[in-house]
Amino acid sequence: MPRVKGGTVTRRRRKKVLKLAKGYFGAKHALYRVANQQVMKSLMYAYRDRRQRKRDFRKLWIARINAAARMHGLSYSRFMHGLKLAGVEVNRKMLADLAVNDQAAFAQLADLAKANLNK
């Protein structure tokens, strides 16, 4: 049986890595070994940060809701507890959007939360 050389497969694999490394600085976009290391690291960062993004957005929404709630004399936790007692099931993303874009509606929710805390 004749020897099979893997030149075609190797070239295809290396081209795929170098294509993923397009836009990297210096040797990282041109040399296979360095590019491969950077692509692997970049994929690890991408995997990690897809999960981190969810946490970051939740933090941002909570900060916005807290700031708006404090303008109405409530802390974030008391505001959320008041909404829960009132049976309002609006998620943090929507609450943060209301806090930024529709302050009148947020004020009504804050009043509702206050009323249910005092019961």
UniProtKB/Swiss-Prot annotation:
PROSITE patterns: RIBOSOMAL_L20
Disulfide cross-links: none
Purpose: Binds directly to 23S ribosomal RNA and is necessary for the in vitro assembly process of the 50S ribosomal subunit. It is not involved in the protein synthesizing functions of that subunit.
NCBIfam families, A to Z: rplT_bact
PANTHER family named in the record: 39S RIBOSOMAL PROTEIN L20 (PTHR10986)
HAMAP family found in the cross-reference section: Ribosomal_bL20
Protein's recorded name: Large ribosomal subunit protein bL20
Upper classification of the organism: Bacteria, Bacillati, Bacillota, Bacilli, Bacillales
